[in-house]
Curated annotation (Swiss-Prot):
Its cofactor is Zn(2+). The keyword Hydrolase applies. The gene is 13. It is found in: Virion. It comes from Bacillus phage PZA (Bacteriophage PZA). This is Morphogenesis protein 1.
Length: 365
């Protein structure tokens, strides 16, 4: 999840949003230095909050709004409306910034660097924060070295760059046809398990991300899997996930089997306690298989997640989605990264004055 509201964000909330922005823009070709230079400015402008109105004056479109405090807000809002996308939305605002890069908008080349050159630059985050301040934000007070400090902070305390290999969790089957939903009266009472059928018996489903088989239950015909890394979920959250596929027989893999995203993972089936060919699916937060529990029917022990919040349904045919909020995503899988620098998180207290940034004092673009 990301934080979108008309309030000043806390440190922990800003970090969630900043990490999302880093991941998103890395996968669109930006360097980590350029992203963090912009984040140093966003922190002062909006506390990295896409829902923030200048001075908390919600609806005053003559003032600033959003991550970079577009002023007047109506310029950005009208653009979003013309694009048919929600304006108070993280992805929409990042799309606007990418549009500005591609259309040479908003940027005044005051530091001998174009916007397209900026997003590819490997200058220091501090230098790039000052360039972004001068050429993009152009506030009433241009003397704000704190934005450079903030840019350096984000560079040192966010993980990844170039996407860090972050993959979108893709729904495993190419169709959605539900025969029993969450809290189903037949065998899902109290659980978030869902049963799916294919277009034929023994219908295939595929690995939603790079993953490893961590448990095999022959008597009940199930395999448990964990993601090898954190994944981007359909609801925008980044987390490890663990799930079970139930009813294929015989089971096709042993514990320790590794699959790449898109590899064949299994088929619908009639193994275990079953009344017809289908696939029973259940997912929890985290990377540890903890066995099963009863709620009162059986499900994975741990924090269950809604399948429709975890797995994006890009290019999936929905025949019967049971009315659930299935989501597509614009996320593009990362292709690696430098692993970031996570060893300076203890400096948070030293930077608390930075986090009470001049966004609280009304600076605006």
């Amino acid at each position: 999840m990301v934080y979108v509201s008309n309030k000043y964000l806390t440190m922990s909330e800003m970090k969630v949003n900043a990490q999302y922005i880093l991941n998103y823009l890395s996968n669109n070709g930006w360097t980590k230095q350029a992203i963090c230079g912009m984040l140093g400015n966003m922190q002062s402008e909006s506390t990295i909050n896409p829902g923030l109105w200048q001075n908390l004056d919600e609806g005053n479109t003559s003032l600033g709004f959003g991550l970079v405090q577009w002023t007047p807000a109506s310029n950005y809002i009208n653009w979003a409306n013309n694009q048919g996308i929600p304006y108070k939305n993280m992805d929409s605002e990042l799309k606007r910034i990418i549009w500005e890069v591609n259309n040479n908008a908003q940027w005044n080349n005051l530091r001998d660097m174009t916007f397209k050159e900026y997003i590819k630059s490997t200058k220091t985050p501090r230098e790039l924060a000052m360039i972004f301040l001068a050429s993009y934000e152009r506030p009433a007070n241009p003397n704000q070295p704190v934005r450079g400090d903030q840019a350096e902070y984000w560079y040192k305390n966010l993980s990844g760059g170039g996407g860090g290999g972050l993959q979108l969790a893709q729904f495993p089957m190419d169709i959605i046809n539900i025969t029993q939903g969450e809290n189903g009266s037949f065998s899902h009472k109290g659980t978030l398990c869902i049963d799916f059928v294919g277009k034929t018996e023994k219908y295939p489903y595929y690995a939603p991300c790079d993953c490893t088989c961590v448990w095999r239950g022959d008597a009940s015909a199930y395999l448990a899997w964990t993601s090898d890394k954190e994944v981007m979920c359909a609801d925008g959250s980044v987390r490890y996930i663990t799930w079970v596929n139930v009813h294929e027989s015989p089971l096709p893999f042993d514990v320790g089997k590794k699959l790449k995203k898109g590899d064949l993972m299994g088929h619908t089936g009639i193994g275990g306690n079953v009344t017809g060919d289908h696939w029973h699916f259940n997912v929890i937060d985290g990377k540890e298989y903890q066995g099963w529990t009863k709620k009162p029917d059986s499900c994975l022990a741990g924090t269950e997640l809604h399948i429709y919040d975890v797995f994006a349904v890009n290019n999936v045919e929905i025949i019967n989605g049971n009315g659930y909020d299935w989501k597509t995503s614009d996320w593009q899988d990362g292709d690696g990264g430098d692993g970031g620098d996570d060893n300076e998180n203890n400096k948070t207290k030293d930077l608390i004055t930075l986090l009470l940034s001049d966004a609280l004092h009304g600076w605006k673009a």
